[in-house]
Amino acid sequence: MSLRIYNTATRQKEDFVPVDPAAIKMYVCGPTVYNLVHIGNARPVVVFDTLFRVLQYLYDNVIYARNITDIDDKIMKAAAENGEPISALAARYAAEYERDMAQLNALQPTIVPYATEHLEQMIAMTQALVNKGHAYAADGHVLFDVQSMGDYGELSNRSLEDMLDGARVEVAPYKKYAGDFVLWKPSADAEPGWESPWGRGRPGWHLECSAMIEKHLGNTIDIHGGGRDLIFPHHENERAQSQCAHDGEQYVKYWMHNGYINIDGEKMSKSLGNFRTVRELLESFPGEVIRFALLSAQYRSELDFSAELLEQSKASLDSLYGALRKTEEEILPAGPALAASPGFAALMDDLNTPLAISELHQLARTVHKAEPESEEAQSAKGMMLALANLMGLLQEDPETWFQGGAEQDVSWIEALIAERQQAKLDKQYARADEIREELKAKGILLEDSREGTTWKKA
């Protein structure tokens, strides 16, 4: 069974054939750190974290880089408004980003490069492009000459004319062509800047990723991921810079892009004021619920994110954890059987997480129907955990999941449950009902089964 992924560059699904099976290389565009990240920033993290997990299952050595853009006009503006150094603001929000992503069960990438630590590589790549006739200096700027590249626009499937018609292009007098983009720009005295052959300045956004990939992953990588909004101009320009700097050598073999997020049926945008930060959502829902919601649609499709979706995701996870909680017997690890399972096949088909999640529910039904101590139940639980782990789900102990976040004293709750159990044995059913209602009023729900009574937070 081969991993198949949709390649934006060819606009079709392809078998994944790595450049070097001994070292799989994947890069995903990370955040520009000037504020708390919104749910749209989280989707590529969760999507490509899932791919990272699948690749780690398939290959011994997977190198995953996700950058931090810590120099940008937005960061400069936010720092000025806050009256704090740019580096301090960027460091603070980078830490907040990592904190939020950890709450979503995202693994730490192999490499987390910061843009400001790669100025030497950025200047060197810019100089190489000038030397090769693909870039030119003008009025303190260095610009990439898009007309110097014969297949510029191939990734986004646009002509130069289409790009100018459909994009916000800065028309500056120092440009040879309106579509030329900035590699290096001058910095005013009050702005951050670095010395270069073209004067004191700072890099353009597109250059940063190209330089970081070159340093840490080499000239050609297997997978480059990000949101669909990055296809043009960011990824198109990355590809142009890197391939022209390396004499046409292929930059990326497989380009992958996740779809947009809509909020309550409307596209998330600043103008609509419907941004939802991950931190805001974490105040109401566990991170695993948010992750489940993000995986509930196939990654290339648009996702309608809403409170209803989060409630549905919480209910689904409750059901899955309920199956894991059903028996205390030791599980049987899935082992090699995972690779032959329908759920694994779904993930191998361009990360079809909705289908894989439906397989988790099927396994949960098997657990519920089987005798708790049976091999069938334990095998199904083992398969559930193995498949869920590839999606970063079911990472909690079931008891912790159901009891987590309850502020009530656990010993008090369990003492009342024991009293209720004794009341039932003594046929004092009115008292047993009183205890149930008392706990319910405190947000604690009881579940009776033949194995005993368990509780969870409402």
Curated annotation (Swiss-Prot):
Subcellular location(s): the record lists: Cytoplasm
Kindly give the InterPro entries that the UniProt entry links to this protein: Cys-tRNA-ligase, Cys-tRNA-synt_Ia_DALR, Cys-tRNA/MSH_ligase, CysS_C, Rossmann-like_a/b/a_fold, tRNA-synt_1_cat_dom, tRNAsynth_Ia_anticodon-bd
Give the matching Gene3D superfamilies.
Cysteine-tRNA ligase, C-terminal anti-codon recognition domain (1.20.120.1910), HUPs (3.40.50.620)
Which residues are noted in the entry as ATP-binding?
A: K270
Highest taxon, organism lineage: Bacteria
Q: Tell me which GO cellular component terms the UniProt record holds.
A: cytosol
Task: For the motif 'HIGH' region, give the residue ranges.
Answer: 31-41
Cofactor binding description: Binds 1 zinc ion per subunit.
| GO biological process, alphabetically ordered | cysteinyl-tRNA aminoacylation
Q: Does the keyword Hydrolase apply?
A: no
The enzyme's first-digit EC class, named in words, is: ligase
Pfam families membership: CysS_C, DALR_2, tRNA-synt_1e
- Parts forming coiled coils: none
Subunit info here reads:
Monomer.
Question: Known NCBIfam families for this protein?
Answer: cysS
Family, according to the entry, reads as follows: Belongs to the class-I aminoacyl-tRNA synthetase family.
Full protein name? Cysteine--tRNA ligase
- Origin organism is Teredinibacter turnerae (strain ATCC 39867 / T7901)
Traced from the root, the source organism's taxonomic lineage reads:
Bacteria, Pseudomonadati, Pseudomonadota, Gammaproteobacteria, Cellvibrionales
Q: Which gene encodes it?
A: cysS
